[in-house]
Amino acid sequence: LTEEASMLTLQFSQNVLKENKAYTLHITDETQLDGLPNTAIAAAAQNAKEQEKEGWIFTLDYPSYSPFMTYSTQRELRKEMYMARNTECTHANDSNNLEICKRLINLRRELAQLLGYSTYADYVLKHRMASNVENVYKLLNDLIDAYKPTAIKEVKEIEELAKEMEGNDFEMQPWDFSFYSHKLQMKKFNLDAEMLRPYFQLDKVIEGVFGLANKLYGITFKENKEIQVYHPDVKAYEVFDKDGSYLAVFYADFFPRKGKQGGAWMTEFQGQWIDHKGNNVRPHVSVVTNFTKPTEEKPALLTLGEVETFLHEFGHSLHGMFANTRFESLSGTNVWWDFVELPSQFMENYAIEKDFLRTFAFHYETGEPLPDELIERIVKSRNFM
């Protein structure tokens, strides 16, 4: 049962990747770029150039999809992008995941019942910090009670702003939400991702994150171009502990490419373990993201959200690099999937720490530091939406 479930889970993911990469929005009319920031336009032009096409190509990868949905004034194109992303693997083709989902549900139910549990959730939660289904429902209901009034208020504000801009007959649709919530955020806080992007040059962010790791844990990173990598975009670093001893190999794989899964994650190519001779075999870990690639005119520039993503996945990589156990199956991130998020969520909190931002957040053209007033606006806007 578990083997079949594993194979179906893998097939599910492969189908999603296939559908994700199959879609592109090819624009040749420059007027259809209205509202988009220069960084998104330049990245789309680069995509088209790499495919030997004229114009601009937008994809369902987050660095392309997110700014399009947030800034594009072309409502019908937003709808097209939204529907493409949110109907993946539901079409009448060989990538449809409906039957896979049905089979997985039945397999999990059968597995749980064979082991004496009422549901698969009961089986899984037996070894999680929540312990049981009742505790999960209690937490969810507590969160709903705490946040629902604010959520209703903010959604109403977004709808009112949209009607103010478009007329009283305007009806909000899912593909409008990012666009108008951004408008409301600008109205409330005068802040958006593109205002911050020039201060978050990827190379500087890397230096800042490595410097933070050195300050907190005493470890150092040294790029080693002799280490074999699996793609030219990937960089490899040797990591050394505070006493100078070898700790790990760290791979940085930051940019989208054909066939690469969307999103961000940390993975291990080699886990830590103690071999039969007593040697401490050190781990090889990788942080994988899909940040906007550099162009001929600009270096890779991140949003604050992407800085936070980097810190989150870097937290996972630290979990892997600091591993020191006998068995590889128990080392690093090979822990229950609720606790595994603790190091990552701890690290991502540094994204809005002033002292951390001051170590690397400088305008890529002028060298000016990120203004304190912008940092204050960031903090104030954190609880919005």
Language model region names:
Residues 3-59, 102, 107, 113-293, ...:
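Active-site-proximal, well-structured secondary-structure segments within enzyme catalytic domains
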Residues 62, 85, 291-295:
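Short, histidine-centered active-site or binding-site loop motifs used for metal coordination
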Residues 64-68, 89-94, 125-136:
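Second-shell loop/turn segments in exported
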Residues 71-89:
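Short, charge-rich amphipathic alpha-helices with coiled-coil/heptad character
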Residues 83-102:
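A short, flexible low-complexity segment enriched in Lys/Arg and Gly/Pro that occurs
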Residues 93, 97, 198, 202, ...:
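Alpha-helix N-cap/helix-initiation motif
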Residues 109-112, 116, 213, 293, ...:
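Active-site recognition of the HExxH zinc-binding catalytic motif
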Residues 309, 313, 317-350:
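Zinc-dependent metallopeptidase catalytic helix centered on the HExxH motif
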